[in-house]
């Protein structure tokens, strides 16, 4: 019986006298159709290296392995260690937020691979940030199940109410697409919110040198630090306001331009011009 079976899952939990832990955002996917849709969306091919975060009982791990992927899984809850060790993959009981992704090579990881995961919702943003700041050149694609509200935020367009710093951050590294929505009925126990799968196709090259990336995101974080403010006011602690006004005018923007109306490409132009003034 597949690990996506709710009967199999509940039988396991009874056998270890365990339960889903809310503190770890444990809502287990128990819908085989959704698992197959994730696999298709993720573009996993036989022989691909795949990093999975929070496998839990291993329902997603099982379909990744059936596709011929080499899976490395990071799971925080030791309750699942013995069960996951029965699958032909590398399992590490660890906190994914603290795990050094550079050590994947020690486990045989070769070249560019993929991330495919049902991310714990309480650490979604720290993990997405970690994937790209720690080793952005390691991934071909990143396909994650996250809270629907967050999925809409990271796929928002300039001018949308959800458009923000995380949107700009992820679009710098990848083409980010909202794939599909997932009902709470597809999980055990049922979460109180809807979920969604987001697929990111990572760029072959990035628009800035590695040495400039941190400074650029300091600018974009400051820009969105207080959403209702004008861009020039948001950046006043980083750059003199008159310089910001000068750059905005040079690019054809009004002094009243707000951060949530600006595209990534325009932020890059603003960054370069402010550096050169």
Swiss-Prot record:
It comes from the Bacteria. It catalyses: adenosine(1518)/adenosine(1519) in 16S rRNA + 4 S-adenosyl-L-methionine = N(6)-dimethyladenosine(1518)/N(6)-dimethyladenosine(1519) in 16S rRNA + 4 S-adenosyl-L-homocysteine + 4 H(+). One of its GO terms (molecular function) is RNA binding. GO terms for biological process: rRNA methylation. One of its GO terms (cellular component) is cytosol. Keywords: Cytoplasm, Methyltransferase, RNA-binding, rRNA processing, S-adenosyl-L-methionine, Transferase. S-adenosyl-L-methionine binds at residues 27, 29, 54, 75, 95, 118. The keyword Cytoplasm applies. Its EC number is 2.1.1.182. SMART domains: rADc (SM00650). It is found in: Cytoplasm. Its main location: cytoplasm. Belongs to the class I-like SAM-binding methyltransferase superfamily. rRNA adenine N(6)-methyltransferase family. RsmA subfamily. Specifically dimethylates two adjacent adenosines (A1518 and A1519) in the loop of a conserved hairpin near the 3'-end of 16S rRNA in the 30S particle. May play a critical role in biogenesis of 30S subunits. PANTHER family: DIMETHYLADENOSINE TRANSFERASE, DIMETHYLADENOSINE TRANSFERASE-RELATED. This is Ribosomal RNA small subunit methyltransferase A. It comes from Chlamydia trachomatis serovar D (strain ATCC VR-885 / DSM 19411 / UW-3/Cx).
């Amino acid at each position: 019986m597949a690990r996506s079976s709710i009967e199999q899952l509940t039988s396991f939990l009874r056998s270890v006298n365990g339960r889903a832990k809310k503190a770890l955002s444990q809502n287990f996917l128990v819908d085989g159709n959704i698992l197959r849709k994730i696999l298709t969306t993720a573009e996993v091919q036989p022989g691909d290296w795949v990093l999975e975060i929070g496998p839990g009982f291993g329902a997603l791990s099982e379909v990744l392995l059936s596709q011929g992927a080499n899976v490395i899984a990071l799971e925080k809850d030791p309750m699942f260690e013995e069960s996951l060790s029965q699958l032909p993959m590398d399992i590490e009981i660890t906190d994914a937020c603290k795990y050094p992704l550079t050590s994947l090579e020690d486990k045989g990881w070769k070249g560019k691979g993929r991330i495919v995961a049902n991310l714990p919702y309480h650490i979604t943003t720290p993990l997405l940030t970690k994937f790209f700041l720690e080793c952005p050149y390691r991934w071909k694609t990143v396909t994650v199940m996250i809270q629907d509200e967050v999925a809409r935020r990271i796929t928002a367009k300039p001018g949308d109410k959800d458009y923000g710093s995380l949107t700009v951050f992820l679009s710098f590294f990848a083409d980010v697409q909202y794939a599909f929505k997932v009902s709470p009925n597809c999980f055990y126990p049922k979460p109180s919110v809807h979920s969604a799968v987001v697929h990111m196709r990572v760029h072959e090259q990035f628009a800035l040198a590695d040495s400039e990336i941190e400074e650029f995101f300091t600018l974009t974080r400051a820009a969105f630090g207080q959403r209702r403010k004008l861009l020039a006011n948001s950046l006043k602690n980083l750059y003199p306001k008159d310089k910001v006004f000068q750059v905005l005018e040079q690019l054809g923007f009004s002094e009243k331009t707000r951060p949530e109306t600006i595209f990534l490409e325009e932020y890059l132009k603003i960054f370069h011009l402010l550096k050169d003034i």
